[in-house]
Design a protein with these regions (language model features):
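Conserved glycine-rich "GG(E/T)P / GGGxP" loop and the immediately following alpha-helix
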Residues: 6, 12-232
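Flexible mid-to-C-terminal extensions adjoining Fe-S/redox cofactors in radical SAM and related proteins
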Residues: 1-13, 29, 33-35, 284, ...
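Aromatic-lined glycan-binding groove of carbohydrate-active enzymes
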Residues: 209-249, 281, 286-292
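A conserved catalytic-core signature of glycosyltransferases
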Residues: 79, 278-280, 311
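Short, small/polar residue-rich loop motifs at catalytic or cofactor-binding pockets
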Residues: 271-279
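The −1 position to Zn-ligating cysteines in a subset of zinc-ribbon hairpins
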Residues: 22, 26, 265-268, 332
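N-terminal [4Fe-4S]-dependent radical SAM core
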Residues: 1-16, 63-68, 257-272, 320, ...
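Short, well-ordered beta-to-alpha junction loops that form the rim of enzyme active sites
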Residues: 180-183, 233-236, 287, 296-297, ...
Length: 342
């Protein structure tokens, strides 16, 4: 199937919309620590542009044969940023309530202040999921791994406690969770994992799978918040090669996806394969209103449209869009753990 045929077959099922592309953390496993947030994503999206984008997608969904799937009803806000720092956060909630959309908050927890929690509770049902990405629950370890001043640690714990009480209904239905990112011995290729260490991998990290850092910090979180869903994530990725100096998936990609055959080509994205993968089944929009390739297109190198001057139908699946996907299959996607090779 050609890329053009794929656009004809698949609708947009998911949206990643990032109205403010800045993060206050510098987590050790994230490009923000090493590269900073992309400059073109640091805008504060206006409410007018935000509503234009949302209305455009709703209109396409409700058309007889629009570009957006009939099942579309929400989005993610997660291009290495903190949606809770968006100064129009309440207006975002109001817009979603108006258009009957919901979204998921991914946060490091420090900006999840009581004021933001109260807003989430006020517009109940708009935020249908909260996942806190917290790498540790001992102050010194947390500060070192998150890149946030240790003085903020008590605020983090206080925020979580307030939120789990105020949003108890989300705790009960398991839509409010804590994700502890890290590594253990089984993360690495010599033990069957998909990672290899880079020169900047934290040398002080205890990788014992039972008593090491990840296991210990996860256990502490479970003890601090016994009624919450807490899970560890030892399977980190290198963001299509951006984190090579820290950790890399390249050897695993060569071994597991290409079968050590350099002639194999990318034919599709396996992240959401059932809806066409990220390039076809998802729409990604940054704070400048630009449509770009996917969550691993960190610097927005593969832009193909702008909601500031265009509507979705002006660029989606058009020649420039197809050319950008073709280019990505020969470049960034070859270093991505979600690529499908043939």
């Amino acid at each position: 199937m050609t890329i053009k045929e794929s656009f004809e077959k698949y609708k947009i099922h998911q949206l990643q919309l990032d109205p403010f592309g800045v993060c206050n953390a510098r987590c050790w496993y994230c490009p923000v620590k090493y590269l900073g947030n992309p400059e073109s994503g640091k805008e504060v999206m206006s409410i007018e542009l935000l509503e234009k984008i949302i209305k455009n997608l709703i209109d396409e969904r409700d058309k007889e044969d629009g570009l957006v799937a009939k099942s579309f009803g929400g989005f993610y806000t997660a291009h290495y940023n903190e949606i809770l720092l968006y100064k129009h956060f309440e207006e975002l909630l109001k817009l979603c309530q108006k258009y009957k959309l919901c979204f998921i908050v991914l946060s490091n927890g420090v900006p999840l202040t009581p004021e933001k929690v109260d807003l989430i509770a006020k517009y109940k049902g708009v935020v249908n999921g909260i996942c806190l990405n917290v790498p540790a629950f001992e102050a010194e370890v947390w500060s070192k791994r998150s890149g946030i001043n240790i003085k903020q640690f008590d605020k983090l714990i206080s925020n979580i406690n307030y939120a789990r009480e105020k949003l108890s209904f989300m705790v009960e239905n398991k839509s409010f969770s804590i994700q502890v990112n890290g590594s253990n011995e089984y993360s690495f290729s010599d033990k069957g994992g998909w990672l290899d260490k880079g020169v900047d991998f934290p040398s002080d990290m205890d990788l014992d799978p039972i008593n090491g850092e990840l296991a210990t910090q996860t256990k502490i979180a479970q003890e601090l918040f016994p009624n919450m869903q807490v899970f560890s994530v030892p399977s980190l990725i290198d963001r299509a090669g951006l984190l090579d100096s820290v950790m890399t998936n390249k050897n695993a990609i060569e071994r597991n996806l290409k079968a050590n055959d350099p002639t194999k080509k990318v034919v599709m994205c396996g992240n959401g394969r059932e809806v066409g993968g990220r390039p076809m089944g998802w729409l990604h929009v940054n704070a400048s209103g630009d449509a770009f390739l996917c969550c691993n297109d960190y610097e927005f190198d593969f832009k193909f449209g702008s909601f500031k001057t265009q509507e979705l139908a002006d660029f989606w699946g058009k020649d420039e869009h197809i050319a950008k996907v073709e280019e990505s299959y020969n470049t960034i996607c070859r270093n991505c753990a979600s690529a499908i090779f043939e």
